[in-house]
UniProtKB/Swiss-Prot annotation:
Taxonomic source organism: Nasonia vitripennis
Protein name: Retrovirus-related Pol polyprotein from type-1 retrotransposable element R1 3
PROSITE patterns listed in its UniProt record: RT_POL
Residue numbers spanned by region Nucleic acid-binding endonuclease: 229-383
The protein's enzyme class: transferase
Length: 383
C-alpha cells in the first residue's frame, strides 16, 4: 500500500488471473469499508486496475469488489493510469508519459507564440527564465522514477524514449531561439545553452539518488565515485559528468557543424544568444541556415549557389571572410578570425568579449548590405 494525500496505490501479486482478481477484490474491499466508516467516498470513476508486469491480458476486464452487503463495485482494467502526475502504461511503460508531455508542451508553446516572435517579443533573459522556470520543471517532474527507461523503444524499430524526450525539447527551443526550422536540435541546444533533456533527466535523477539509493550502469556516476563525498561534492561531480556527456555528443554528431565552428566547448553554450540576441543575421552566421544562396540551392529554393560577386558558392564564411563586396566592413584580425591551412577558424570569436564587441556590428553591417543587394537584384529582374 502506498498513499499520498487522497491518492492510494494498492499492489497485488499472483500467478493466475483469478488470483489477481481475488487479491485485488480483498484489498479494495478494505478500502471501501474504511472510507464508509470515516465518511469518505471512494471515486468509482478514478479507481482502476492495471498490470505492471507479466504477460496476462487484463485489459477490458472488470474486478468485482464486495462491500459488505452494499452494491458490489466494478473496477475496470485499463492500459494506462496517471498517479501523482506521472502517466504509466502496462508493464511500467513510461512512453505514455513522454507522449502526453509533448502534447502539453506543444499546446503551451502555441499559447505563447504571441510573445515569441522571430523579430520581436520577450527578451532573451525572460525567455530563458520561462524555459528554466516553467517548461523544464514540468518536463523533469518525477524524472528519478522513469529516467532508467529512456534507453527503451516504444515499438521495435521506433525511436528510443530519450530521442522522444529530445524531440519535446526541440518544440520548446525552436520557439525560443528564433532560428530557421531546418536548424538541428543539437545546434539549438548549444545556441540556447540548454542541456539535452535526456542528459538533464539523468543529471536530476542522479542528484536525487546521491542521497542514498545505489547507482546503476546507465547513471552518470558510480557508487565508487561518490564514496566519502559530501552531498554538495556529489552534485558537482554529477554536473561535471553531465557536461562531459554533452561534450562527447556534440563532438560526435554530424549535425550543427557550422555552429560547432563557432562554439566547440559546450561550457560556452548560450553565450552566442547573449551577444547576438534575436538578430536574424546573427543566427544565420552561427547556423549557416538562412538566405545564403548555397543553403537555398541545396533545398531547391534558388537557381544557383553563386554569390553576386561571381564566386561559385555563397555561404556564411564567404560573406564574413572572403567576399570583396563587404571588404569595407571586414577586420578579421580584430574579431579573432584566423586563416589556417584548412580554411577559416572562427572558434575564438566568442571566447573574447572585446572581439565580440567588434564582430557583431561589423558582420551585421555586412549581412544587412547583402540583403539590400539581393533586394535590388530582385527589383531589377522584375523590372
Amino acid at each position: 500500500v502506498d498513499a499520498f494525500a487522497d491518492d492510494l496505490l494498492l499492489l497485488v501479486q499472483g500467478n493466475r488471473r483469478n488470483e489477481l482478481e481475488q487479491s485485488a477484490s480483498e484489498a479494495l474491499s478494505v478500502v471501501y469499508r474504511y472510507g464508509t466508516n470515516i465518511g469518505v467516498e471512494v471515486s468509482d470513476s478514478k479507481t482502476v486496475c492495471m498490470m505492471l508486469k507479466g504477460s496476462l491480458n487484463m485489459l477490458n476486464r472488470v474486478v468485482h469488489v464486495s462491500t459488505n452487503g452494499m452494491d458490489d463495485k466494478r473496477i475496470r482494467c485499463v492500459d494506462r493510469v496517471r498517479y501523482l502526475g506521472v502517466n504509466v502504461g502496462i508493464g511500467m511503460d513510461f512512453s505514455v508519459h513522454i507522449d502526453g508531455m509533448k502534447r502539453r508542451l506543444t499546446t503551451a508553446i502555441m499559447r505563447l507564440r504571441g510573445v515569441l516572435r522571430k523579430s520581436w517579443g520577450l527578451k532573451r533573459g525572460v525567455v530563458s527564465m520561462v524555459v528554466k522556470g516553467l517548461f523544464l520543471p514540468a518536463v523533469m517532474y518525477g524524472a528519478s522514477v522513469w529516467y532508467e527507461q529512456l534507453h527503451k523503444r516504444k515499438l521495435r524499430g521506433s525511436r528510443r524514449l530519450s530521442e522522444e524526450l529530445v524531440s519535446c525539447q526541440r518544440v520548446v527551443l525552436y520557439a525560443c531561439t528564433r532560428v530557421c526550422r531546418t536548424v538541428s536540435t543539437e545546434a539549438m541546444q548549444i545556441l540556447f545553452g540548454s542541456l539535452p533533456w535526456d542528459i538533464e533527466c539523468f543529471r536530476r535523477a542522479n542528484c536525487t539518488k546521491s542521497k542514498g539509493p545505489a547507482m546503476n550502469e546507465s547513471d552518470l556516476v558510480t557508487d565508487e565515485d561518490l564514496y566519502e563525498l559530501s552531498l554538495h561534492e556529489c552534485r558537482e561531480l554529477v554536473d561535471q559528468r553531465a557536461l562531459a556527456a554533452w561534450q562527447d555528443r556534440w563532438e560526435a554528431t554530424s549535425n550543427g557543424r557550422v555552429t560547432y565552428e563557432w562554439i566547440r566547448d559546450v561550457g560556452f553554450s548560450g553565450r552566442s544568444m547573449k551577444y547576438f540576441g534575436a538578430e536574424p543575421e546573427g543566427l544565420l552566421r552561427l547556423t549557416g541556415h538562412g538566405s545564403m544562396n548555397s543553403f537555398l540551392f541545396s533545398r531547391n529554393l534558388s537557381n544557383s549557389p553563386a554569390c553576386a560577386c561571381g564566386t561559385e558558392r555563397e555561404d556564411w564564411i564567404h560573406v564574413l571572410c572572403e567576399c570583396d563586396m563587404y571588404a569595407a566592413f571586414r577586420d578579421l584580425d580584430s574579431i579573432g578570425v584566423r586563416r589556417t591551412e584548412v580554411g577559416w577558424d572562427v572558434s575564438g570569436v566568442l571566447l573574447d568579449r572585446a572581439s565580440m564587441s567588434v564582430c557583431v556590428p561589423l558582420s551585421s553591417c555586412a549581412f544587412r548590405m547583402r540583403e539590400l543587394i539581393v533586394q535590388r537584384m530582385r527589383e531589377n529582374e522584375e523590372s
